[in-house]
């Protein structure tokens, strides 16, 4: 009897020892990915499985009773929630999501010489509009800025070497506008630069904000960023043959607020934009230059417009732009809105009569070290 019990005990011990050896020698399971760790942490915060999150809080939050079930203080909860959100962040290589909701790729280094800013103007506005831009924002980075105009101007040429005579009509017609845009596009492609940005001669460009925005996207990707002036896609009639047209819908960034296109996308636009093709493409829909850009990008290439509230035109109420957020805006403008003077409301060293566009005051607000800005200015 004792001998039989001893034999059973020895067999049990041998079996247990063998099981331990197998467990120790087996490969350990791989550690969970950071995102999975984050999701597990969030699930632990949410309490037992099946607890429903409170409306509006998303998957990361549950009912208050469940949230505090496994933590003992608010500071511990927020610490764990912050760590969980960080761990459950975008997967490797994915784009961070900024405050405006648009996913953006990781930043790439960007210098002023990487950006080609085309300023469209006409000779009759050289003194009235262009001189103001040369005095303010263009003076900070002349190497970035290329002025496209329809008339010779020796004074302008002496002030900046980047003047392009387009040989286009001075009329404000869709054909003349498309002619200038075609020249802008071709010059950008020839430049080899990473980014093409178009603005009008009534725009103020905040160069630091522009570089910050563009550095959020890789220039090799398809990027078309700007601000639409309509609350819905525009409808055009696309001519597909001599006697046949069809409706087409697309979004476009208004040229009056400015827009930017990456080199990667600009190269794909070449069949419809390079040489004389841009003019032909514009005739297919019989719309102006900025609409034609949107048509090529959205309707023909299938690349969606990235809407940004940092671009502004005179078609919106500019007095709603907060002075405290001026440093974040990419473009500003001035003009008339609903039959009233339309400009950014900003206090500064210059009166409205002396500075109706408010561009000088804006410039001194952004660059107080400018020699002609009064040192005692209060904003």
From Swiss-Prot:
Q: Which InterPro entries match?
A: Fringe, Fringe-like_glycosylTrfase
Highest taxon above the source species = Eukaryota
Please list the residues that bind Mn(2+).
202, 314
Where does the chain bind substrate?
129, 201
PTM comment text = A soluble form may be derived from the membrane form by proteolytic processing.
Instruction: Report how it sits in the membrane.
Output: Single-pass type II membrane protein
- Provide the protein's localization: Golgi apparatus; Golgi apparatus membrane
Glycosites: 167
Give cofactor(s), names only.
Mn(2+); Co(2+)
This chain belongs to the protein called: Beta-1,3-N-acetylglucosaminyltransferase lunatic fringe
Which source organism does the UniProt entry give?
Answer: Homo sapiens
Specify the taxonomic lineage: Eukaryota, Metazoa, Chordata, Craniata, Vertebrata
């Amino acid at each position: 009897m004792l001998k039989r019990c001893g034999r059973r005990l020895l067999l049990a011990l041998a079996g247990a020892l063998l099981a331990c050896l197998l467990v120790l020698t087996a490969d350990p399971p791989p550690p969970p990915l950071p995102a999975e760790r984050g999701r597990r942490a969030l699930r632990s915060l949410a309490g037992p499985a099946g607890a429903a999150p409170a409306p509006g809080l998303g998957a990361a939050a549950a009912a208050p009773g469940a949230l505090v079930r496994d933590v003992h203080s608010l500071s511990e909860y927020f610490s764990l929630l912050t760590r969980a959100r960080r761990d459950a962040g975008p997967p490797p290589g994915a784009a961070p999501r900024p405050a405006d909701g648009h996913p953006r790729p990781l930043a790439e280094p960007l210098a002023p010489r990487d950006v080609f800013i085309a300023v469209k103007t006409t000779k009759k506005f050289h003194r009235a509009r262009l001189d103001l831009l040369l005095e303010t924002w263009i003076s900070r980075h002349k190497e970035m800025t290329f002025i496209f105009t329809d008339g010779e101007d020796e004074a302008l040429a002496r002030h900046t070497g980047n003047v392009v005579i387009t040989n286009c009509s001075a009329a404000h017609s869709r054909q003349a506008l498309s002619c200038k845009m075609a020249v802008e596009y071709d010059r950008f492609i020839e430049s080899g630069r990473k980014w093409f940005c178009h603005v009008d001669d009534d725009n103020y460009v905040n160069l630091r904000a522009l570089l910050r925005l563009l550095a959020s996207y890789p220039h090799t990707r398809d990027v078309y960023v700007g601000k639409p002036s309509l609350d819905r896609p525009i409808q055009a009639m696309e001519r597909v043959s001599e006697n046949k047209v069809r409706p087409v819908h697309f979004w476009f960034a208004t040229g009056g607020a400015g827009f930017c296109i990456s080199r990667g996308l600009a190269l794909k636009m070449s069949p419809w934009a390079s040489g004389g093709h841009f003019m032909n493409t514009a005739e297919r829909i019989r719309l102006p230059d900025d609409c034609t850009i949107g048509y090529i990008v959205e309707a023909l290439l299938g690349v969606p417009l990235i809407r940004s509230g940092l671009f502004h035109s005179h078609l919106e109420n500019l007095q709603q732009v907060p002075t405290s957020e001026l440093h974040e805006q990419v473009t500003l403008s001035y003009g008339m809105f609903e039959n009233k003077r339309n400009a950014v409301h900003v206090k500064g060293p210059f009166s409205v009569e002396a500075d109706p566009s408010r561009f000088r005051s804006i410039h001194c607000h952004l660059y107080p070290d400018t020699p002609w800005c009064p040192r005692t200015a209060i904003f």
